[in-house]
C-alpha cells in the first residue's frame, strides 16, 4: 500500500519566502516528496517559478510574459533572493529524488516545462496542473500540451467557485480523451464519496489546502479499497509530513 504523497506548496509554505530556492530547500529537508509551484513563461522563452502575473518595471506594472530574464533578475524578493528559473531549480536539487507540480495558465509554458524536464531527464518527475482559479474547459489549456507529449502527468484542479462539485465539474469525458490522470480538489469540497467516485473512474485523487490537524488526520486516514488518498498539498508541510508518518507508518 502506498502512502499519501506530500507536496509542499510553493516550497515550505508559510515558512519563509515562498517560491524561492531556500523555501524549496527547506521543504526537502522537512521530508516532502514534491514541490508545488507556479510556472510563468517569459518573453525570451525562459520559465520562472512565481505566482506573480506582473512586476514593476520603471514604476509601471508589466505582465510577466512581457519581461525577459534580465528584468526578472533585477527584482528582489523579501529575503533578497531573486525569482528562480526552472533550470536553476532543477540544477539545485538534481541530487534529490524530488517531484514537481506546476500550475500554468498558458499551454506554451507547459510545453517549455516539458522540454526543459527532458533536458534534465526529469520528465517522469513533473506534473502540469490547471489552476483551481482557471474557469475554462480542460481542452483550452491541455489539448496543445497533450499533442506535444502523450505521457506527461496532467492534473485537473476543480474550479474553486464550484461550491458543490457535481459530476459535470469533473469533466470526465475530456479527462479521458486527453489522458488527464489526476483530479485535485480543495479540502473544503473533498469527501469520501468524491474520493470513491474519482478512484472508480480510474483517476488519482489529490486534496489541496489542508492546514488544520483535524482535517489532516481525517484525509490521511481515509481509505478506499485499501488505498489512501494519493496526494495532498499544504502550506504547513512539516505538520502534514509528521502526521502522515504517524498515521500511515506501518504501510
What role is predicted for each listed range?
Residues 1-251:
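Phosphate-group recognition and catalysis centered on beta-loop-alpha active-site segments
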Amino acid at each position: 500500500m502506498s502512502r499519501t504523497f506530500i507536496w509542499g506548496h510553493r516550497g515550505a509554505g508559510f515558512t519563509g519566502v515562498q517560491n524561492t530556492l531556500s523555501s524549496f530547500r527547506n521543504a526537502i529537508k522537512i521530508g516532502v516528496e514534491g514541490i508545488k509551484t507556479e510556472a510563468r513563461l517569459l518573453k525570451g522563452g525562459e520559465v520562472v517559478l512565481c505566482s506573480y502575473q506582473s512586476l514593476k518595471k520603471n514604476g509601471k506594472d508589466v505582465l510577466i510574459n512581457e519581461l525577459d530574464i534580465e528584468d526578472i533578475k533585477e527584482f528582489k524578493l523579501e529575503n533578497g533572493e531573486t525569482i528562480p528559473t526552472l533550470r536553476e531549480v532543477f540544477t539545485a536539487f538534481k541530487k534529490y529524488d524530488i517531484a514537481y507540480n506546476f500550475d500554468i495558465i498558458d499551454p506554451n509554458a507547459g510545453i517549455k516545462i516539458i522540454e526543459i524536464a527532458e533536458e534534465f531527464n526529469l520528465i517522469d518527475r513533473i506534473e502540469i496542473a490547471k489552476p483551481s482559479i482557471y474557469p475554462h474547459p480542460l481542452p483550452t489549456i491541455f489539448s496543445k500540451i497533450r499533442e506535444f507529449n502523450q505521457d506527461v502527468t496532467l492534473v485537473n484542479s476543480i474550479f474553486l467557485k464550484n461550491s458543490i462539485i457535481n459530476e459535470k465539474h469533473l469533466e470526465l469525458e475530456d479527462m479521458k480523451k486527453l489522458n488527464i490522470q489526476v483530479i485535485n480538489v480543495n479540502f473544503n469540497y473533498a469527501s469520501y464519496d468524491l474520493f470513491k467516485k474519482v478512484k472508480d473512474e480510474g483517476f488519482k485523487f489529490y486534496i489541496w489546502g489542508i492546514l488544520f490537524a483535524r482535517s489532516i488526520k481525517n484525509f490521511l486516514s481515509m481509505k478506499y479499497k485499501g488505498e489512501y488518498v494519493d496526494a495532498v498539498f499544504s502550506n504547513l508541510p512539516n505538520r502534514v509530513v509528521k502526521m502522515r508518518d504517524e498515521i500511515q507508518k506501518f504501510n
